[in-house]
Amino acid sequence: MGLEVVVPRVASVELAALLDGLGAAGLPSALAMVDNVLQGPGAIPPAVWRDARIRTPAGIVTLRRVPSGVAVVVFGNADDALRAAQRTIAETLLALH
């Protein structure tokens, strides 16, 4: 079971812009997987996606499109550092729109 934060009404978000925003917010991150396809270093993120995994220094965070926006999900046993990364990603998503 995961811990989920839903960022409401985020219609579309460019993953490259999100990664740039996270770097500016002090959370250097990389794209690990998009729609069940592994992403290598330097891979260009697709413009359209349903599910993405973001690698942060604290661990992996899942982004999943839901009808009400984008869900930012971590494992239920996430430590404080991973929960902080989850909040930073949610805040950055909100700031992009």
Language model region names:
Residues 22-25, 34, 41, 85, ...:
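Low-complexity, intrinsically disordered/propeptide-like segments
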Residues 18-20, 31, 35, 74-76, ...:
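Generic detector of ordered, mature protein regions
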Residues 1-31:
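Short, extreme N-terminal segment that most often corresponds to the first beta-strand
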Residues 47-97:
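Charged interaction segments
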Residues 17, 23, 38-39, 54, ...:
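Low-complexity, compositionally biased segments
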Residues 28-56:
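Ser/Thr-rich, low-complexity intrinsically disordered terminal regions
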Residues 1, 20-25, 39-41, 58, ...:
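Feature targets compositionally biased, intrinsically disordered low-complexity regions
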